[in-house]
């Protein structure tokens, strides 16, 4: 396999990975909005919605954790993509 082919394959993989991370970030944003809406509805329900409020809070926490993981992953992919491009330019 030629070096250019390997670099193209690595670059393509990084692009697909970047797209998948973007999709994860979109899902995280939707989850965050749903958690906020659930908190609002739990507050409206008063005491009867207290347990639902706890669940909504936990969903929000999970959403934030996903956000941090996706951000770290995106940074790693961007770094690898940049290195792949640098190697390609030097060839």
Label the predicted regions.
Residues 1-8:
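Short, low-complexity N-terminal regulatory "tails/caps" that precede and couple sensory modules
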Residues 8-30, 43-86:
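Parallel, heptad-repeat alpha-helical coiled-coil signal-transduction segments
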Residues 33:
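N-terminal glycine-rich anion-binding loops that anchor highly charged ligand groups
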Residues 88-91:
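Alpha-helical coiled-coil heptad-repeat segments
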